[in-house]
Amino acid sequence: FLPLLILGSLLMTPPVIQAIHDAQRG
């Protein structure tokens, strides 16, 4: 469960969220 938790927290960091939004926008 720990690796999943770390991965989840990494995905919730602002730079990653911004990158995801940019990717979805095209």
UniProtKB/Swiss-Prot annotation:
It is found in: Secreted. Expressed by the venom gland. GO terms for cellular component: extracellular region; host cell postsynaptic membrane; host cell presynaptic membrane. Keywords: Amidation, Ion channel impairing toxin, Neurotoxin, Postsynaptic neurotoxin, Presynaptic neurotoxin, Secreted, Toxin, Voltage-gated sodium channel impairing toxin. The glycine-PoTx is a non-amidated form of poneratoxin, with an extra-Gly at C-terminus. This loss of amidation does not alter toxin activity on Nav1.7/SCN9A. One of its GO terms (molecular function) is toxin activity. It comes from the Eukaryota. The modification Arginine amide is found at residue 25. The variant A23E has an 8-fold reduction in potency compared to delta-paraponeritoxin-Pc1a. The variant D22N/A23V, has an ~5-fold increase in potency compared to delta-paraponeritoxin-Pc1a. This is Glycyl-poneratoxin. It comes from Paraponera clavata.
